[in-house]
Amino acid sequence: MSQAVQTNGTQPLSKTWELSLYELQRTPQEAITDGLEIVVSPRSLHSELMCPICLDMLKNTMTTKECLHRFCADCIITALRSGNKECPTCRKKLVSKRSLRPDPNFDALISKIYPSRDEYEAHQERVLARINKHNNQQALSHSIEEGLKIQAMNRLQRGKKQQIENGSGAEDNGDSSHCSNASTHSNQEAGPSNKRTKTSDDSGLELDNNNAAVAIDPVMDGASEIELVFRPHPTLMEKDDSAQTRYIKTSGNATVDHLSKYLAVRLALEELRSKGESNQMNLDTASEKQYTIYIATASGQFTVLNGSFSLELVSEKYWKVNKPMELYYAPTKEHK
């Protein structure tokens, strides 16, 4: 095929197009006139309806005037504003937004293929909001846990430093080695008279004269942690007892006996401190007092816990509530 073009000059210019074998053999497709429907899976069209930038379905489609590639309006405008002013697909130069034109026909085609797209996008937004909320809560709880650990370490270091400066402190007790190291969360009352005074024994158990919270031992990190609210028994404890509510966080593998031994040592040490004594022999003698651990049942009764029960077993058997487990203590009857 050739074409001659006459110009103002003396010689005509001619162009010749060489057709390939495919172009020579091809025939136009016949139009469908009998109502035949061809079923095409929407999944097979996904690559054609996908924005190359956000990899999601095209929304408010914009087409480049130069290379005819399609993008979401927000995606391509953001790319031109922050990128190299070129097509993200073929790298052809795009000067500005004037190199783009809206493509409402393509949007209409997408809405025809996916008539429930608004519902899909609303569902997608709800899922993303739920994921973001969950991640934010996880980040917050992780930050709080890390902060509490750092505070516990700082308290422990201050206690040891104070012990070194004073030249005195309680020694490690063999029975209390099963108890958790201290991480104090005290309910401190207002007023200068309630300032906390802290001491620390060699095992790292931090003590103060206010409400105490105990953290899990590092060697027990693999076990699940359980939070406890430890209160004196409302009827078996005498009114003049100086017992206080204690907040404890320890391993689920710890047993009721561990709590009883910890309580005996802790109360004995506080009693000696109130009397101005710090002799280890006096501490061993005073800590021989035994305590019984109780839990309140749904009927309002107090059940004595077996000393061999782990705290995890107690929680599964008696508590079954997603909040700190409430336990009660009182001196064992034969020691009263």
Swiss-Prot record:
GO molecular function ontology, one term from the record: zinc ion binding
Annotated effect of mutating H69Y: Loss of ubiquitin ligase activity
Keyword Magnesium appears in the UniProt entry: no
Ranges annotated as spanning the membrane: none
Pathway(s) of this molecule: Protein modification; protein ubiquitination
Pfam families (alphabetical): RAWUL, zf-C3HC4_2
Protein name: E3 ubiquitin-protein ligase RING2
